[in-house]
């Protein structure tokens, strides 16, 4: 993946709040959120605040190792239940591998992401931003702000 899409903290909060507005419009009485660790943790915290949801759990699936997709995903921890009246939150749906696991674990859940790539898009119930399949998304928790020398000094 040669191109990168840089996500700032501000962008993430704005997009997640847009998702919260959409979820409010569904008029569903949500009982909780399941955050897909780790990418869904920050969006889940924002959604929980905006929707007034106090019950937040996690499902922990190892699918990425820093910047490369793992072929074999490992379920480390599951949340209980079938997902009824639950929002499952991840930061993105990429190839759909993790999303298929989520759908099997929580068939009654409402599955949302902030970003969606073409191969996984149909596996989520809602998302905010379309991303091309060949673009790598850099999330704010994976980056830091650092000094860059002026061009004249290079």
From Swiss-Prot:
> Does the record bear Iron-sulfur in its keywords?
no
Q: Which pathway is this protein engaged in?
A: Purine metabolism; GMP biosynthesis via salvage pathway; GMP from guanine: step 1/1; Purine metabolism; XMP biosynthesis via salvage pathway; XMP from xanthine: step 1/1
Where is 5-phospho-alpha-D-ribose 1-diphosphate bound in this sequence?
Answer: 38-39, 71, 90-98
Q: Which residues bind Mg(2+)?
A: 91
Cell compartments where the protein resides: Cell inner membrane
Q: What is its EC number?
A: 2.4.2.-, 2.4.2.22
Question: For this UniProt entry, what is the primary localization, expressed as one broad class?
Answer: membrane
The entry marks the following residues as binding xanthine, namely 94, 137
Question: Which cofactors, by name?
Answer: Mg(2+)
Keywords, A to Z, come to:
Cell inner membrane, Cell membrane, Glycosyltransferase, Magnesium, Membrane, Metal-binding, Purine salvage, Transferase
Task: Give the domain of life.
Answer: Bacteria
Name the top EC class: transferase
Q: Which reaction does it catalyse?
A: GMP + diphosphate = guanine + 5-phospho-alpha-D-ribose 1-diphosphate; XMP + diphosphate = xanthine + 5-phospho-alpha-D-ribose 1-diphosphate; IMP + diphosphate = hypoxanthine + 5-phospho-alpha-D-ribose 1-diphosphate
Residues noted as binding GMP in the record, renumbered to the chain:
71, 94-98, 136-137
Gene3D superfamilies with a match to the protein in the record: 3.40.50.2020
The molecular function terms of the Gene Ontology recorded here are: guanine phosphoribosyltransferase activity; hypoxanthine phosphoribosyltransferase activity; magnesium ion binding; xanthine phosphoribosyltransferase activity
An example of a Gene Ontology cellular component annotation for this protein is:
cytosol
Gene Ontology biological-process entries: GMP salvage; IMP salvage; purine ribonucleoside salvage; XMP salvage
Q: Where does guanine bind?
A: 94, 137
Task: Report the membrane topology from the UniProt record.
Answer: Peripheral membrane protein
Task: Describe the family membership recorded for this protein in Swiss-Prot or TrEMBL.
Answer: Belongs to the purine/pyrimidine phosphoribosyltransferase family. XGPT subfamily.
NCBIfam families noted in UniProt: PRK09177.1
Question: HAMAP family this protein is in?
Answer: XGPRT
Please give the function described in this protein's UniProt entry.
Purine salvage pathway enzyme that catalyzes the transfer of the ribosyl-5-phosphate group from 5-phospho-alpha-D-ribose 1-diphosphate (PRPP) to the N9 position of the 6-oxopurines guanine and xanthine to form the corresponding ribonucleotides GMP (guanosine 5'-monophosphate) and XMP (xanthosine 5'-monophosphate), with the release of PPi. To a lesser extent, also acts on hypoxanthine.
Q: How does it assemble?
A: Homotetramer.
Protein name stated in the entry: Xanthine-guanine phosphoribosyltransferase
Species of origin reads Buchnera aphidicola subsp. Schizaphis graminum (strain Sg)
